[in-house]
Amino acid sequence: MFKNPEFIRNTWTELTAKKLAAMPLLLITVYLLAYILDEALPFSFLPYICVFFYCVFTYVWSTRLAAETVIREINANTWSFQVMTSMSPVKMAVGKLFGSTIYIWYGNFICFALYLLSYHLHRERLPEVPLPELLTNVLIFVLFGLSAQILPLLLSLHSIRWRHFFEKFDVTFFQFMGIAMIIPLYKVFNGSGEGIVWYGAHYTAKEAAVVFLSVFIVWGFIAIVNQIKTEFGQEPYPVSWFLFTLSLVAVLFGFNDYGSDNPLVRYVGTLSAFFAVLAVTYLTLCGESNMALRPNMVSKYYHGKQYKRLFMIMPRSLVTIPVIIVLALVLSAEFGSLGQEQGTSAGFMVWAMILFMLRDFCFIYRWSLFAQGNEKETTVVPVLIALSTYTIVPVLLYHFDLRIFCPFFMPYFHESSYLTYNESAFLTVIPPALEFVFMLVLLTLGIRKKFRELRV
């Protein structure tokens, strides 16, 4: 880190002599005043003063700095010079994330020291808290602080792919997403004392926070590195995205409660993983831009037998398809083990969702293949069109009493009086299967047409 030029540059900019002297002077002065006033009260509020300053520094100040660290470079037209340097994406990520907020952490660690000191000075007027638990609290504060900084920086890096100038409102929005991390912090210390059960073991709220925040920070930092790789003209490895989806599934799968008789509670982890990966896939489609299909590059790499490069330009949304299909198989097996008709219909509903998703993939890729102008720069429009078929169209069909057509626009089960329950459930997958085949044929014809144009 100390051989990182970006980190060193930001450190010299942030840690000036005046600022280094001002921070402890401010905090110690306020602490001494609070200590004097605190003597007249029946209980001590000194630790809460320290936590208050930590929250102000972290959630108000550092989130702003993290959101602005790249946007300032964009607005000042200096980001392009940094992109052309020989610095690695990892060093740039470390420099931007930790260098721009190092002064905040200088103040935060002073707050942490005063926080621990408060429990030593006023042991008789504060709840007895063992030192290991106090150190765990400090660790949680650090993890929440890093998470609150990673989120706005990641959002700002993602947004610069589409725009090259930003207003204060944009930065405030990114900052607000980091500020929102204060809500789970409050719940950990005040609202979730019972903890959770994960993979059959009971964890307190603080233990769960350490585990899940650590996972979030690791993948958040990897995502920042991948975004910077894209800015540097390098393609991030699809393997990292695949491993991220697997880790997301592994985390959520642990919430299954196999001791419950309620299927929704019993398989809540698998259901959450399925819908989470499904949602992440659609969000990825929105952000892939014209990377969704690169027929000219595909043709070039394929005929040149550059299979590694061909693998590198694979759309991230395609990487998640095997994960979603495996989750669908697991859900089908779990619902099938219930031995109930409802389990059979639920299994068919899951596969109907898969077929609708594949239909949307074909439609969105077909759109991006021939989109022109701004439409080619983003797949947001076709994604919104595809998702509207699950909301607007079914509502209209319900309004005009045309429910018989709902299975063509959303996973919909209707028990027919002319068929058995299982036959009615099977019919759930027929409409999306037909639509998927139709869109797949259109996509195939479009790809062939595009390749013919490239040969000419």
What do the PLM-derived regions correspond to, one by one?
Residues 1-76, 95-456:
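Hydrophobic alpha-helical transmembrane segments of membrane proteins
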Residues 81-90:
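Short helix-to-coil transition segments within interhelical loops
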